From Swiss-Prot:
Signal peptide start and end residues: none
Family annotation (InterPro entries): FadA, Thiolase, Thiolase-like, Thiolase-like_sf_Thiolase, Thiolase_acyl_enz_int_AS, Thiolase_AS, Thiolase_C, Thiolase_CS
Active site annotation, chain numbering: 91, 343, 373
Enzyme Commission number, as recorded: 2.3.1.16
Phylogenetic placement of the source organism: Bacteria, Pseudomonadati, Pseudomonadota, Gammaproteobacteria, Enterobacterales
Recorded family membership: Belongs to the thiolase-like superfamily. Thiolase family.
Annotated pathway: Lipid metabolism; fatty acid beta-oxidation
Pfam families the UniProt entry points to: Thiolase_C, Thiolase_N
Domain of life: Bacteria
Any one Gene Ontology BP term: phenylacetate catabolic process
Protein name as it appears in the record: 3-ketoacyl-CoA thiolase
Subunit description: Heterotetramer of two alpha chains (FadB) and two beta chains (FadA).
Protein role: Catalyzes the final step of fatty acid oxidation in which acetyl-CoA is released and the CoA ester of a fatty acid two carbons shorter is formed.
């Protein structure tokens, strides 16, 4: 079986969805920009030699509809002979795109693929056109489709206080801002055109979603966002609304060596699981355990973790039940996470994997794990091994 390697991984800056830098930039253009950039950064691979493009996107309508993967590839002037498909596993879409490409390579059906994902939540809101079947409530809790209430449920089940959530959210912003100031994101962010507050076209090379002034005291003043009577989850402890894209160049190890391209990491194992939709945010726990089992590893073998921060109330129970609560500051989301950077749904799986690869290199660790919860009760995880 072929070994699957990550040759390169990049992303756009994360832009605020409301009046942000990408308010006049379409999702297809964000995607095409990264496709072009990956190919330009790795000229040894001819674009025509790509076997397929796998691109995650959740709200596949309006500018994100009609197979955005193919639309973006055509805009990027990828040869017409290269196919492209859009993948949807809700929040895990671009990580699923990676898994799909990896399996094609493992089976020998592909040698080189572009993978990634995008979501422009400013142009296509998360709730746009959603119409849940009324009979769904016969099988799952009525609130299972309301992500904020599933986070409230997890917080109550696991004893996660409002204070704990506020502290974690403040940490996310502080670490993301520190990473920005130190240049830790420089290797992963591709400068991307957008408009500043005055409408001036410029190149952005930083995440504008981060709020460096965030404090626990300020967060404590916010009202509950989903359960106004007894809730603890606020807008400040939820993932920010942002627009962005991320992309990876995935190849067989043999093809990478043939082309003289240095792999950054191998895909050691992959897993996806289902869980109760009422506690959808718990999905990373069984997904991570399954991925580790497949890799023949334990939690203690993993040097750094990237866990998508849908909500502080959601990620803290996952950290606790993976036995990592005492190691948060050594291993978990060391450059902050989605609370500070935002969670552009179809982009996030590739985004956290890209950030993880850079952290693995910076911390000089052998193994890293990226994992995310998924709406309606799923979890997805990937174990990476540095080459």
């Amino acid at each position: 079986m072929e070994q699957v390697v990550i040759v390169d991984a990049i992303r756009t800056p994360m832009s605020r969805s409301k009046g942000g830098a990408f308010r006049n930039v379409r999702a297809e253009d964000l995607s095409a920009h990264l496709m072009r950039s990956l190919l330009a950064r790795n000229p040894a691979l001819e674009a025509a030699a790509l076997d397929d493009i796998y691109w995650g996107c959740v709200q596949q309508t309006l500018e994100q509809g009609f197979n955005i993967a193919r639309n973006a590839a055509l805009l990027a002037e990828v040869p017409h002979s290269v196919p492209a498909v859009t993948v949807n596993r809700l929040c895990g879409s671009s990580m699923q795109a990676l898994h799909d490409a990896a399996r094609m390579i493992m089976s020998g059906d592909a040698q080189a693929c572009l993978v990634g994902g995008v979501e422009h939540m400013g142009h296509v809101p998360m709730s746009h056109g959603v119409d849940f079947h009324p009979g769904l409530s016969r099988n799952v809790a009525k609130a299972a489709g309301m992500m904020g209430l599933t986070a409230e449920m997890l917080a109550r089940m696991h004893g996660i206080s409002r204070e704990m959530q506020d502290a974690f959210a403040a940490r996310s912003h502080a670490r993301a801002w520190a990473a920005t100031q130190s240049g830790a994101f420089k290797n992963e962010i591709i400068p991307t055109g957008g408009h500043d507050a005055d409408g001036v076209l410029k190149q952005f090379n930083y995440d504008e979603v981060i709020r460096p002034e965030t404090t626990v005291e300020a967060l404590a003043t916010l009202r509950p966002a989903f359960d106004p009577v007894s809730g603890t989850v606020t807008a400040g402890t939820s993932s920010a609304l942002s627009d962005g894209a991320a992309a990876m160049l995935v190849m067989s190890e043999s093809r990478a060596h043939e082309l003289g391209l240095k792999p950054r990491a191998r895909v050691r194992s992959m897993a996806v699981v289902g869980c109760d939709p009422a506690i959808m945010g718990y999905g990373p726990v069984p997904a991570s355990k399954l991925a580790l089992k497949k890799a023949g590893l334990s939690v203690s073998d993993i040097g750094v973790f990237e866990m998508n921060e849908a909500f502080a109330a959601q990620i803290l129970p996952c950290i606790k039940d993976l036995g990592l609560i005492e190691q948060i500051d050594e291993k978990i989301n060391l450059n902050g996470g989605a609370i500070a950077l935002g969670h552009p749904l179809g982009c996030s799986g590739a985004r956290i994997s890209t950030t993880l690869l850079n952290l693995m290199e910076r911390k000089d660790v052998q193994f890293g794990l990226a994992t995310m919860c998924i709406g309606l009760g799923q979890g997805i995880a990937t174990v990476f091994e540095r080459v």
